[in-house]
């Protein structure tokens, strides 16, 4: 982010409840296909005319699913979220126990965790397929009576594997390659800043307990601050989500779950050190983070801002820090993963050099799911506004190859965003179902939370009215 001159500143019959679970699953599967509008309702077995139901109306983790007469109970009311989950009771997800991939595994409900064992796809042929297992949701033994178990099984086209109630999407094998040319559709403005703020910007987002958790920077026009949205289920809910200020600024943040230490990390800029981190066991609490610690203490030359816009990512051995300098360069530092969270020190490597406009800021790095590939995006300044260029690499320590790297053929920009409310596609984050340090994104279902502004908005950078929007990749 360009800082300008800002200071740093119950009816509980078991069978009925199981019916509810099935309905939820279908909705979730729709959401894991290329992003679609969220929906709620029941999922009905085509061969049985009975609904997916949580046994006994239980809301406990591990409660099993069954077929039962459709009756409209809450244990048969499922919500398909645009994060690829099928939820019931608001905070429970349709779940495959222990990430199992064997036919005959019974499905259950569990607290939403962001795992791939809670991702589903509803296909146009009526099947509901687990993304992680590739198996179909079915009524066991082609049963139709109340109480029939619901399980995973090899997809075979049987009527006990067909469900109705939701619109399907064309089947896929669950893996995709990055496109060479990106085409997006865009939401409109998703939220307005609350009183006292002129901008919402610099977003970082994860999926936490089945909901979007978004941190960002704020601007009052004269100083920067930081905030978090109260968790919400669908992007259309962002406008009504609470906007909660942090009592200690964390500008241009990066949020992720560091699985090796079972801790959440929030990294940011501007404070006692160029880059700082804090940790927490509850990322939804904006003021529950630990005391600041140094993340990086080095300096760079030829930059008016100094180190800016950090991002973090890990492979199996090392944690990597990437950052920009508003000066046409991208930098990298690393440490053994066992030493993290910790201080990268002052050493770094310059890994990319170009003009200031071509490599400006907003660098982000991701692992491409299902591929031996990493994706880097960097914000650039173009004739028609801010846009993102993309690069790929086979390792985080290797060299980066331009992919969609021009204003005419960008990763995301005016040329391909589909947005009508903004020409600028600026500082943001790809949506990740897995919130951990691998920064894994699904190329089958790419979404990009970005900041934009009205084309006629002008004035000092610090007063520009940045707002959130989301791009969805078109296939």
UniProtKB/Swiss-Prot annotation:
Optimum pH is 6. Keywords: Carbohydrate metabolism, Glycosidase, Hydrolase, Lectin, Polysaccharide degradation, Secreted, Signal, Xylan degradation. Gene3D superfamilies: 2.80.10.50, Glycosyl hydrolase domain, family 43. Optimum temperature is 55 degrees Celsius. It catalyses: Hydrolysis of terminal non-reducing alpha-L-arabinofuranoside residues in alpha-L-arabinosides. It is found in: Secreted. The keyword Protein biosynthesis does not apply. Its EC number is 3.2.1.55. CDD domains: beta-trefoil_Ricin_XLN-like, GH62. This is Extracellular exo-alpha-L-arabinofuranosidase. The lineage of its organism: Bacteria, Bacillati, Actinomycetota, Actinomycetes, Kitasatosporales. The gene is abfB.
